[in-house]
Structure formats: C-alpha cells, structure tokens
C-alpha cells in the first residue's frame, strides 16, 4: 500500500531514527498515535503479528529517541513486537510485505537492516547475545550502548536467567527492558511508580547510592542500614526483586505507554554503569479494543476489516492436523487416566485448548521451557504415567540433550507429538520444521513415524502411546488434513510400510504428508508408490524388495535431505550392497525463507510438478 502523508503527517517526517531524534518531544505522543494507526492499517491489509506491536509503540519511539541507534545497539527478543521498530528504521513503506515471499522478514533480521543487531525468532536469546555485544563494545572503547527488550513470557525461560546470572557476575554496561503486558496499570500506582522510577534512576540518587556503598563498605552496621533503607525506598515501587539479587539495578514498574515518562527514565539510565533493569507495564493490543480484549486471538492475524473488530472465520472445511491431535488426545484421555499432556507455551497452536479445559489436572503448560518440558515428561514416565509432549519441530531442537540423556538412554515411554514439521510458511528460517527427522533418526531405539494423512496420524499417535519400550515420535505438518475417513484406532506394526500401488521400473518411497503430490507423480510416471510410514525402524525388507524389482528408487520427505529418511534408505541399500540408483527429494541444504507453504513447495520442487521434473531430469 502507498503511504498516505495526509493521514500520517508526523510519521511522514520519520523515515529513520535520525529524523525521529529531530522531532520535539511534544510531538511524540502524536507520533505514537499515528504509528499505532499505521500498524493497524498495514497489518490488517497484509496479515502478520499484531497485538504485540501495538503494545510496544511508545517503548520503541522512546528507545530510538534516547539511544543513538544504530550505533547504540538495540536487541529485540523473539521479534513479534518489533513491527514499530521496522517502521521507524527505514522500512515504513515496505511493512505491508512482511512475512510474504520476497518481503520484509517476519522478525528482526541482520541481513535486512543495520538496525537489526540480532536475527531472532526463537525466544529468550536477547540477554545472552546482549551480554556478548556489551562486552565487545566495552573492548571497542567507543562508548557504544547495548539495550535488550524481552517480554514477560520470554523472560521465564531458563536461558534468560542463565544470562542474567552471568551479567550480575561480570557486570557489563547494559540495559534490559522487561516488557510486561500481563496486567493493566492502576492509574494511581502507575503515577507513583513513574515518579519514583525517575527519582531512583536519576544521577543524584545513583551517585549517593554508589558513593555511599564505597564510603561505608568497611563499616558493616552502616552498610547493612544503607541496604535496608534502599530496600525500604524500593519497596514503595516493588516489594523486593529477584533481579536485584541477580546483580541488576532494578527500576520499575513504570507505565510503558507514557512516552515522555519513558524518555526521562531512559535518559537517566543511559549513563549508569553495570547491568540495569527497567520493568515497564504495557497492554498487549493497546489502542485497538478487540485486540486488548483478546490478545491471544489477535497475536497473529490474517487480513481483516479493522472496522468490524472481527477476524474472518475459517471456512469450516477440513480440520487441521493440530485439531486431529487435540481430538485424539481428548479421546484417549477419557479412556486412560494415566495420560499426561505437556506443552511449552503452545496450547492454542498445538490444538490443546479443549484438552486443557476437560482435563486441567492432566494438562501442563510449562511456559517457554522446552528442556524442562522433556525432562519433566521423563519424570512422569518414571512415576508410571504416560506423558505426551506436544511441541513444534523447531522448538524441540532446544531440548535435544534432554531427549537423548533424560528420555532415550533410559528407554522411557514418552510420546513426542511434533507439530509444524516441514515447511511452515510465513515465519521463515527460524521456524521451518526442517531438521527433526535428521536429529532424531540417529538416536538409538527411537521410533519415528511419518503419517501420510490424518487417519494415519491418529493411528500412529495411538501406536506411539502404547509403545512401552522407549520414546516415540509422530511428526505432522502445519495446515489442514486431506479429508480421509477416520477409522477405529489400532496399533500399527512397528517398522512396516505399505505399497499403495504397483508400477514399473521406478518406485517412489514416500515419508509423510507429501503423499498426495507423490501419488500424482506415481500415476503420471507409472511408478510404484510406497507409504513408508516409519523412518525408524525402517522397513528394510520392503526397501530391498523395491530395489530388487525396480530399476531406480525415489525417496520423498519434507525434511532436510542430509541425514533424513532418504539418507536412511541409502544406508540400507549400501549395507546390503545393492547397486540401485536412488534420488532423494526433500528440503535442500539452506535455510528456507518465508512464503506460503504452497509457494515454497513449488519453488523447492516439492509439489507434483516439481517432483516430476526432478525425476525426469535425473532419469534422462
């Protein structure tokens, strides 16, 4: 969309942070209002992450106004909240392309802008990176400042606390801003907090604080009195704080929607030495009432009419694979009170809302703590329960050692329901489920299943749930199922595939939900089509049968070719000294950018047309 100068006259003056810093402070509330309206106008037309950005408008303006970005380095955790940052840093007119193929990256991205210091997408990385950047800046000696912005969800992760513990030890000059949008601010408490925050962050208080510590450090009774006095003053703002114990100078909480107050506090804190912590309170979805009332629904939105206040309803067609999983989970839990379900902050995305309501005592949202989720499941299994870890493929990477050390080595019966496997679409490189088959396949005695449709998905979940000799995994994609009939649940024979149709010369061995595309290719080329079902253990007898009765084999999977299911087929053939030619079709050896699933599959040759072209070129 073209930028309407008449509609956004103040925002029109700001196409860089240098231009922002030329504005008089008095114009900044108006700028924030226009920025929020422009964000609503843009995202409603193009889709994208929405509610988080509405909540960080004032913070973004204040940070870029006070700090000399991009020389001073501003780091956003996760990046859902960074749309206003992109708008103010030279990407205003392109914001309508965000998350689209060839458009702006969905998150801060180093290759996109010098203002994007750290490429992000996964949670809780900002403080660790910020410490490294601050240490490097200190050694550089150019008085470059470092600021990390992290949300109240992301800061619950262990990695964030590991980083803060380290910062308290080495004491780099840096600021961590906690964007806390869990509750709204009482006007009276907020006003008191803002006044005291400015007092406590001011030079006079800081000088007295540090000077007093030095003068009286050798006099234990006075040192203790000073400590208690300071704690009493701070108790008016917040009654004790973990962040002070970790070594940070804590200020807050303050109103994150008071842009002028934020500027005063940030200016006071800018020159303080050592690790600083500013706690701000914001409202997710601020300025757009429907998003304020339902920030979860409006977290990421499709195109919608902002005047209606409603998101478009789904067409009511085929269920998603997440819904298939959620329904199976409820069905199984109703029959077995040993079932326990775990998710690391992905209740809605993983299809677990209904389960959490029906079985609240068997539902565990452990927050953004993938490592804990897996080892917690191990403990439940040791205790005689049947844990299921529902997790996105890209986030299971964060708990790899726990899968190995705490589950697999001990042969514990934990079922991993791996959602968002394969190409996920608009979230791009950081969220593609490209690697799970590769990193799980090498784990001894792990059972790994790849359903070709929703009925197989249910049967495999049932099979994995009743597998008691070790861990198992079922991986399924983002998006809708294909519409096959759901049959009664029964256990599948472990490690056995099935031949779907017989052809000549060429056999296609399919792993997973690319089956409809593979079926079209098999029909066009008169090829045998096999639903392999299991990546581990592989159906070696079936692979050898196909090798003996065909001139060439093709493997198909929506996972990295390197180390994936096709690599496993190659290993079987080489181990048995079978000289048959094999073409492995899957995800290539680079990080796949954003675009719709259909766009990226077509570009990568993973639709029927692309597969057939690859096979014909290979056979020529």
Swiss-Prot record:
Q: Name one GO molecular function term.
A: 1-deoxy-D-xylulose-5-phosphate synthase activity
Cofactor descriptive note: Binds 1 Mg(2+) ion per subunit. Binds 1 thiamine pyrophosphate per subunit.
State its Enzyme Commission number(s).
Answer: 2.2.1.7
> Which branch of life, at top level?
Bacteria
Query: Carries keyword Metal-binding?
Result: yes
Family annotation (SUPFAM superfamilies): Thiamin diphosphate-binding fold (THDP-binding), TK C-terminal domain-like
CDD domains, per database record: TPP_DXS, TPP_PYR_DXS_TK_like
Q: Which cofactor does it need?
A: Mg(2+); thiamine diphosphate
Q: Which UniProt keywords apply?
A: Isoprene biosynthesis, Magnesium, Metal-binding, Thiamine biosynthesis, Thiamine pyrophosphate, Transferase
Gene Ontology cellular-component terms for this entry are: cytosol
GO BP terms, alphabetized: 1-deoxy-D-xylulose 5-phosphate biosynthetic process; isopentenyl diphosphate biosynthetic process, methylerythritol 4-phosphate pathway; terpenoid biosynthetic process; thiamine biosynthetic process
Q: Where does thiamine diphosphate bind?
A: 80, 121-123, 153-154, 181, 288, 370
**Summary of the function given for this chain in its UniProt record:** Catalyzes the acyloin condensation reaction between C atoms 2 and 3 of pyruvate and glyceraldehyde 3-phosphate to yield 1-deoxy-D-xylulose-5-phosphate (DXP).
Q: How does it assemble?
A: Homodimer.
Show the HAMAP family listed in the entry.
Answer: DXP_synth
NCBIfam families per UniProt: dxs (TIGR00204), PRK05444.2-2 (NF003933)
Tell me which family the UniProt entry assigns to this protein: Belongs to the transketolase family. DXPS subfamily.
This one is known as 1-deoxy-D-xylulose-5-phosphate synthase
Q: What is the lineage of its organism?
A: Bacteria, Pseudomonadati, Pseudomonadota, Gammaproteobacteria, Enterobacterales
């Amino acid at each position: 969309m073209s930028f309407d100068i008449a509609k956004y006259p103040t925002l029109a003056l700001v196409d860089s942070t240098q231009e922002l810093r030329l504005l008089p402070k008095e114009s900044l509330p108006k700028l924030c209002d226009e920025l929020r309206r422009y964000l609503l106008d843009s995202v409603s037309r193009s889709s994208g992450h929405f509610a988080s950005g509405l909540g960080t408008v004032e913070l973004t303006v204040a940070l870029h106004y006070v700090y000399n970005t991009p020389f001073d380095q501003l780091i956003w955790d996760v990046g859902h909240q960074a749309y206003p940052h992109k708008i103010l840093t030279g990407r205003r007119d392109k914001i309508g392309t965000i998350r689209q193929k060839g458009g702006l990256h969905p998150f801060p991205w180093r290759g996109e802008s010098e203002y994007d210091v750290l490429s992000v997408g996964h949670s809780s990385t900002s403080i660790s990176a910020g410490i490294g950047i601050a240490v490097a800046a200190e050694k550089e000696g150019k008085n470059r400042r470092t600021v990390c912005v992290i949300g109240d969800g992301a800061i619950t992760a262990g990695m964030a606390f590991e980083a803060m513990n380290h910062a308290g030890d080495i004491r780099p000059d840096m600021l961590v801003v906690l964007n806390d949008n869990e509750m709204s601010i009482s006007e009276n408490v907020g006003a008191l907090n803002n006044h005291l925050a400015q007092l406590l962050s001011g030079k006079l208080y800081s000088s007295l604080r540090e000077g007093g510590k030095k003068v009286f450090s050798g006099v234990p009774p006075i040192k203790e009195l000073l400590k208690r006095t300071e704690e009493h003053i701070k108790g008016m703002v917040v009654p004790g704080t973990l962040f002070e114990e970790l070594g940070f100078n804590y200020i807050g909480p303050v109103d994150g929607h008071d842009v002028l107050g934020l500027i005063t506090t940030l200016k006071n804190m800018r020159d303080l030495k050592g690790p600083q912590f500013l706690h701000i309170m914001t409202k997710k979805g601020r300025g757009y009432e429907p998003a304020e009332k339902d920030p979860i629904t409006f977290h990421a939105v499709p195109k919608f009419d902002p005047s209606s206040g409603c998101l478009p309803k789904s067409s009511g067609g085929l269920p998603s694979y997440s819904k298939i999983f959620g329904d199976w989970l409820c069905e199984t839990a109703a029959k077995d009170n040993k079932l326990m379900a775990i998710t690391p902050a992905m209740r809605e995305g993983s299809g677990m809302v209904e389960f959490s309501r029906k079985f609240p005592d068997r539902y565990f949202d452990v927050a953004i703590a993938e490592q804990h989720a897996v080892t917690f499941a191990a403990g439940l299994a040791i205790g005689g329960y049947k844990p299921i870890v529902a997790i996105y493929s890209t986030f299971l990477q964060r708990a790899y050692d726990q899968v190995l050390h705490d589950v697999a080595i001990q042969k514990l019966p934990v079922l991993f329901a791996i959602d968002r496997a394969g190409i996920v679409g608009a979230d791009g490189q950081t969220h593609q489920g490209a690697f799970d088959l590769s990193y799980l396949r090498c784990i001894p005695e792990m059972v790994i299943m790849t359903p070709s449709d929703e009925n197989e998905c249910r049967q495999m979940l049932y099979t994995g749930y009743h597998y008691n000799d070790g861990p198992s995994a079922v991986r399924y994609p983002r998006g809708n199922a294909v519409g096959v009939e759901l049959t009664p649940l029964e256990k599948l024979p472990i490690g056995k595939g099935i031949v779907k149709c017989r052809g000549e010369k060429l056999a296609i061995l399919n792993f997973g939900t690319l089956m409809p595309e593979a079926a079209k290719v098999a029909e066009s080329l008169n090829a045998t089509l096999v639903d392999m079902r299991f990546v581990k253990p592989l159906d070696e007898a079936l692979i050898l049968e196909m090798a003996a009765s065909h001139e060439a084999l093709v493997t198909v999977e929506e996972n990295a070719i390197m180390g994936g299911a096709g690599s496993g087929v190659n290993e079987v053939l080489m181990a048995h000294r079978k000289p048959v030619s094999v073409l492995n079709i899957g995800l290539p050896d680079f990080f796949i950018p954003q675009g719709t699933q259909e766009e990226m599959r077509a570009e990568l040759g993973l639709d029927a047309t692309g597969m057939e072209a690859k096979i014909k070129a290979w056979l020529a």
